[in-house]
Amino acid sequence: MFTGIIESIGNIGAIIRHNEDLSIVVNTNNLDISDVNIGDSIATNGVCLTVSKLLPSGYTADLSLETYKRTAFHSYRIGQEVNLEKAMLPTTRLGGHLVSGHVDGVGEVIEFKRNGRAINIWVAVPVQLKKYLSEKGSVTIDGISLTINAVYQNVIKLTIVPHTLAETNLVNINIDKKVNVEIDMMARYLEKLIKVDRYESEKTSNVSMDLERYGFIS
Protein backbone atom coordinates (compact mmCIF):
# COMPACT_ATOMS: atom_id res chain seq x y z
CA MET A 1 0.00 0.00 0.00
CA PHE A 2 1.04 3.57 -0.67
CA THR A 3 -0.08 7.10 0.22
CA GLY A 4 0.24 8.92 -3.10
CA ILE A 5 2.86 11.27 -1.64
CA ILE A 6 5.84 11.10 -3.99
CA GLU A 7 9.27 10.68 -2.40
CA SER A 8 11.49 11.20 -5.42
CA ILE A 9 11.61 11.49 -9.20
CA GLY A 10 13.56 8.70 -10.86
CA ASN A 11 14.02 7.70 -14.46
CA ILE A 12 14.03 4.53 -16.53
CA GLY A 13 17.61 3.45 -17.21
CA ALA A 14 16.90 0.38 -19.31
CA ILE A 15 14.06 -1.69 -20.75
CA ILE A 16 14.91 -5.36 -21.25
CA ARG A 17 12.49 -7.42 -23.31
CA HIS A 18 12.16 -11.14 -22.64
CA ASN A 19 10.00 -13.68 -24.47
CA GLU A 20 6.87 -13.24 -22.35
CA ASP A 21 7.58 -10.20 -20.17
CA LEU A 22 9.94 -7.30 -19.55
CA SER A 23 12.36 -6.00 -16.97
CA ILE A 24 13.10 -2.36 -16.32
CA VAL A 25 15.97 -0.67 -14.56
CA VAL A 26 14.93 2.37 -12.54
CA ASN A 27 17.46 4.97 -11.47
CA THR A 28 16.21 6.26 -8.13
CA ASN A 29 18.32 9.45 -8.00
CA ASN A 30 17.93 10.85 -4.45
CA LEU A 31 15.48 8.21 -3.13
CA ASP A 32 16.99 6.43 -0.11
CA ILE A 33 16.66 2.69 -0.80
CA SER A 34 19.03 1.55 1.95
CA ASP A 35 16.02 0.03 3.75
CA VAL A 36 14.65 -1.67 0.62
CA ASN A 37 15.08 -5.42 0.15
CA ILE A 38 14.56 -7.69 -2.84
CA GLY A 39 10.84 -8.51 -2.92
CA ASP A 40 9.77 -5.12 -1.56
CA SER A 41 7.32 -2.94 -3.49
CA ILE A 42 7.96 0.50 -4.95
CA ALA A 43 5.24 2.48 -6.70
CA THR A 44 6.75 3.52 -10.02
CA ASN A 45 4.57 6.15 -11.70
CA GLY A 46 1.68 4.66 -9.76
CA VAL A 47 2.36 1.03 -10.67
CA CYS A 48 3.21 -1.30 -7.78
CA LEU A 49 6.43 -3.04 -8.86
CA THR A 50 8.38 -5.69 -6.99
CA VAL A 51 12.12 -5.13 -6.66
CA SER A 52 13.93 -8.08 -8.26
CA LYS A 53 17.46 -6.73 -7.99
CA LEU A 54 19.12 -3.87 -6.12
CA LEU A 55 21.68 -1.78 -7.98
CA PRO A 56 24.05 1.01 -6.94
CA SER A 57 21.91 3.41 -8.98
CA GLY A 58 18.48 1.98 -8.16
CA TYR A 59 16.62 -1.26 -8.79
CA THR A 60 15.37 -3.71 -11.38
CA ALA A 61 11.72 -4.80 -11.55
CA ASP A 62 9.82 -7.21 -13.77
CA LEU A 63 6.67 -6.30 -15.70
CA SER A 64 4.18 -8.77 -17.10
CA LEU A 65 2.92 -8.12 -20.61
CA GLU A 66 -0.50 -7.46 -19.04
CA THR A 67 0.90 -4.66 -16.88
CA TYR A 68 2.90 -3.30 -19.79
CA LYS A 69 -0.14 -3.12 -22.08
CA ARG A 70 -2.68 -1.89 -19.51
CA THR A 71 -0.58 0.97 -18.12
CA ALA A 72 1.25 3.95 -19.57
CA PHE A 73 4.46 1.92 -19.46
CA HIS A 74 3.81 0.88 -23.06
CA SER A 75 4.58 4.47 -24.12
CA TYR A 76 7.75 4.89 -22.03
CA ARG A 77 11.28 5.17 -23.37
CA ILE A 78 14.69 5.14 -21.72
CA GLY A 79 15.07 8.37 -19.75
CA GLN A 80 11.35 8.63 -18.93
CA GLU A 81 10.90 10.36 -15.59
CA VAL A 82 8.89 8.36 -13.05
CA ASN A 83 7.43 9.24 -9.66
CA LEU A 84 8.67 6.96 -6.88
CA GLU A 85 7.20 6.00 -3.52
CA LYS A 86 8.26 3.17 -1.25
CA ALA A 87 5.57 1.01 0.34
CA MET A 88 4.08 2.63 3.43
CA LEU A 89 4.81 1.42 6.97
CA PRO A 90 2.25 1.11 9.80
CA THR A 91 3.82 4.26 11.25
CA THR A 92 3.61 6.25 8.00
CA ARG A 93 1.58 9.45 8.15
CA LEU A 94 -1.24 9.16 5.59
CA GLY A 95 -0.82 12.52 3.90
CA GLY A 96 -2.66 11.54 0.71
CA HIS A 97 -5.10 8.63 0.51
CA LEU A 98 -4.76 4.85 0.41
CA VAL A 99 -3.28 3.81 -2.92
CA SER A 100 -2.89 0.18 -4.01
CA GLY A 101 -0.62 0.67 -7.01
CA HIS A 102 -3.05 -1.30 -9.19
CA VAL A 103 -3.74 0.94 -12.17
CA ASP A 104 -7.35 1.04 -13.40
CA GLY A 105 -6.68 2.64 -16.76
CA VAL A 106 -4.63 5.06 -18.81
CA GLY A 107 -5.70 8.69 -19.07
CA GLU A 108 -4.51 11.50 -21.31
CA VAL A 109 -3.75 15.13 -20.53
CA ILE A 110 -5.90 17.18 -22.90
CA GLU A 111 -5.26 20.68 -21.55
CA PHE A 112 -3.28 22.56 -18.93
CA LYS A 113 -3.18 26.20 -17.84
CA ARG A 114 -1.07 28.16 -15.42
CA ASN A 115 -2.99 29.42 -12.40
CA GLY A 116 -0.59 31.70 -10.57
CA ARG A 117 2.17 29.44 -9.24
CA ALA A 118 -0.09 26.40 -9.59
CA ILE A 119 -1.31 24.64 -12.71
CA ASN A 120 -4.74 23.36 -13.73
CA ILE A 121 -4.79 20.20 -15.81
CA TRP A 122 -7.63 18.38 -17.52
CA VAL A 123 -7.31 14.62 -17.89
CA ALA A 124 -9.54 12.42 -20.03
CA VAL A 125 -9.99 9.07 -18.30
CA PRO A 126 -11.44 5.82 -19.69
CA VAL A 127 -15.23 6.13 -19.92
CA GLN A 128 -15.80 3.08 -17.71
CA LEU A 129 -14.08 4.87 -14.80
CA LYS A 130 -16.16 8.07 -14.80
CA LYS A 131 -18.77 6.62 -12.42
CA TYR A 132 -16.09 6.37 -9.71
CA LEU A 133 -15.02 10.01 -9.98
CA SER A 134 -16.67 12.85 -8.08
CA GLU A 135 -15.94 16.48 -7.30
CA LYS A 136 -13.69 16.77 -4.22
CA GLY A 137 -13.02 13.03 -4.41
CA SER A 138 -9.55 11.52 -4.65
CA VAL A 139 -7.76 10.07 -7.65
CA THR A 140 -4.22 8.88 -8.26
CA ILE A 141 -2.41 10.16 -11.35
CA ASP A 142 1.01 8.62 -12.04
CA GLY A 143 1.17 7.69 -8.35
CA ILE A 144 0.24 11.18 -7.08
CA SER A 145 -2.71 11.56 -4.72
CA LEU A 146 -4.82 14.43 -6.09
CA THR A 147 -8.19 16.02 -5.37
CA ILE A 148 -10.68 16.31 -8.21
CA ASN A 149 -11.87 19.90 -8.66
CA ALA A 150 -14.53 19.20 -11.28
CA VAL A 151 -15.87 16.39 -13.45
CA TYR A 152 -17.08 16.85 -17.02
CA GLN A 153 -18.30 13.50 -18.34
CA ASN A 154 -15.05 11.48 -18.45
CA VAL A 155 -12.77 14.53 -18.05
CA ILE A 156 -11.49 15.59 -14.64
CA LYS A 157 -9.98 18.93 -13.67
CA LEU A 158 -7.09 18.89 -11.20
CA THR A 159 -5.08 21.69 -9.61
CA ILE A 160 -1.40 20.99 -9.04
CA VAL A 161 0.03 23.16 -6.27
CA PRO A 162 3.62 24.48 -6.48
CA HIS A 163 5.03 21.93 -4.02
CA THR A 164 3.57 18.99 -5.96
CA LEU A 165 4.86 20.49 -9.21
CA ALA A 166 8.36 20.75 -7.76
CA GLU A 167 8.41 17.25 -6.25
CA THR A 168 6.86 15.21 -9.10
CA ASN A 169 7.24 14.70 -12.84
CA LEU A 170 4.16 16.87 -13.45
CA VAL A 171 6.57 19.78 -13.69
CA ASN A 172 7.15 18.57 -17.26
CA ILE A 173 3.46 18.16 -18.14
CA ASN A 174 2.45 18.30 -21.79
CA ILE A 175 -0.63 17.82 -23.96
CA ASP A 176 -1.31 14.19 -24.97
CA LYS A 177 0.81 12.87 -22.11
CA LYS A 178 -0.38 9.39 -21.09
CA VAL A 179 -0.89 8.96 -17.34
CA ASN A 180 -1.69 6.02 -15.08
CA VAL A 181 -5.05 6.42 -13.34
CA GLU A 182 -6.12 4.65 -10.15
CA ILE A 183 -9.54 5.42 -8.72
CA ASP A 184 -10.14 5.77 -4.99
CA MET A 185 -10.51 2.20 -3.70
CA MET A 186 -13.29 3.37 -1.38
CA ALA A 187 -15.43 4.17 -4.45
CA ARG A 188 -14.95 0.66 -5.81
CA TYR A 189 -15.78 -0.95 -2.45
CA LEU A 190 -18.89 1.21 -2.17
CA GLU A 191 -20.03 0.07 -5.61
CA LYS A 192 -19.51 -3.55 -4.57
CA LEU A 193 -21.56 -3.08 -1.41
CA ILE A 194 -24.40 -1.45 -3.35
CA LYS A 195 -24.42 -4.30 -5.88
CA VAL A 196 -24.50 -6.92 -3.11
CA ASP A 197 -27.30 -5.10 -1.25
CA ARG A 198 -29.31 -4.78 -4.47
CA TYR A 199 -28.82 -8.48 -5.27
CA GLU A 200 -29.84 -9.57 -1.77
CA SER A 201 -32.89 -7.28 -1.89
CA GLU A 202 -33.98 -8.65 -5.28
CA LYS A 203 -33.38 -12.23 -4.12
CA THR A 204 -35.50 -11.70 -1.00
CA SER A 205 -38.25 -10.09 -3.08
CA ASN A 206 -38.29 -13.04 -5.51
CA VAL A 207 -38.49 -15.56 -2.64
CA SER A 208 -41.42 -13.66 -1.10
CA MET A 209 -43.24 -13.64 -4.44
CA ASP A 210 -42.76 -17.41 -4.80
CA LEU A 211 -44.03 -18.07 -1.26
CA GLU A 212 -47.07 -15.89 -1.92
CA ARG A 213 -47.73 -17.57 -5.28
CA TYR A 214 -47.89 -21.00 -3.67
CA GLY A 215 -50.01 -19.86 -0.73
CA PHE A 216 -47.41 -20.02 2.01
CA ILE A 217 -47.83 -16.34 2.81
CA SER A 218 -50.47 -13.76 1.96
Swiss-Prot record:
**Its GO biological process terms?**
riboflavin biosynthetic process
**Which residues are recorded as binding 2,4-dihydroxypteridine 2?**
48-50, 62-67, 101-103, 136
Enzyme Commission number(s) of this protein: 2.5.1.9
Molecular function terms from GO: riboflavin synthase activity
* tRNA-binding as UniProt keyword: no
Pathway this chain belongs to: Cofactor biosynthesis; riboflavin biosynthesis; riboflavin from 2-hydroxy-3-oxobutyl phosphate and 5-amino-6-(D-ribitylamino)uracil: step 2/2
Q: Per its UniProt entry, which superkingdom is the organism in?
A: Bacteria
Q: Which residues bind 2,4-dihydroxypteridine 1?
A: 4-6, 145-147, 159-164
Report each Lumazine-binding repeat as a residue range.
Answer: 1-97, 98-194
Q: What does this protein do?
A: Catalyzes the dismutation of two molecules of 6,7-dimethyl-8-ribityllumazine, resulting in the formation of riboflavin and 5-amino-6-(D-ribitylamino)uracil.
Q: What is this protein called?
A: Riboflavin synthase
What's the name of its gene? ribE
